[in-house]
């Protein structure tokens, strides 16, 4: 029993030195930071490369796709804030001291699913002629250098109909945004 108490005491002391809420140190030249942004309703990764070049990979939003709030626990603190706002706020916070603080140098869209780019369900009206969800909403807050996706400018591989079927209704919004 004494041994169990000793082990327990050791683990308590060890855990005191581990703090999950510590802020990440600022990026430094030569470092590579890879941030998976946990917005709870889609995929988004922000990369700061050793030379300060930045890239965002995907910016999805499927907030309205599920009625179960347990699927998106990160929205419990303020359900009025959107995925786009959360992503932009995070990126701007970590970009303050970078060569291009207003937004990533590159945006890479891996594929045309809602959890990677946004979707019609839950889309907000935009003032620039396209709906806001996922990447189109993030683009309201951040300035991007170059976009990379599969299919620009025709989006016809394997066929236009097939590409449109990947994310019904949102591809026209994405094209207008670009």
Spans of model-derived segments:
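Positively charged n-region of N-terminal signal peptides that target proteins for export
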Residues: 1-4
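Ser/Thr-glycine-rich phosphate-binding loops at phosphate-binding pockets of nucleotides
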Residues: 110-111
């Amino acid at each position: 029993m004494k041994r169990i108490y000793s082990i327990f005491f050791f683990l308590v002391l060890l855990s005191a030195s581990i703090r999950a809420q510590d802020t990440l140190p600022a990026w430094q030249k030569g470092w590579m930071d890879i941030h998976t942004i946990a917005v709870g309703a889609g995929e988004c990764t922000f990369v700061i490369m050793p030379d300060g070049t930045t890239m965002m990979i995907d910016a999805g939003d499927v907030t309205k796709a599920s009625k179960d709030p347990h699927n998106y626990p990160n929205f419990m603190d303020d359900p009025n804030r959107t995925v786009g706002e959360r992503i932009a706020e995070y990126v701007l916070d970590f970009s303050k001291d970078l060569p291009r603080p207003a937004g990533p140098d590159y945006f890479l869209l891996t594929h045309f699913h809602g959890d990677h780019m946004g979707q019609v369900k839950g889309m907000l009206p935009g003032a620039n002629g396209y709906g806001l969800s996922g990447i189109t909403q993030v683009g309201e807050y951040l300035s991007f250098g170059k976009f990379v996706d599969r299919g620009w400018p025709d989006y016809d591989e394997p066929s236009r109909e097939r590409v449109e079927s990947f994310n019904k209704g949102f591809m026209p919004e994405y094209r207008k945004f670009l």
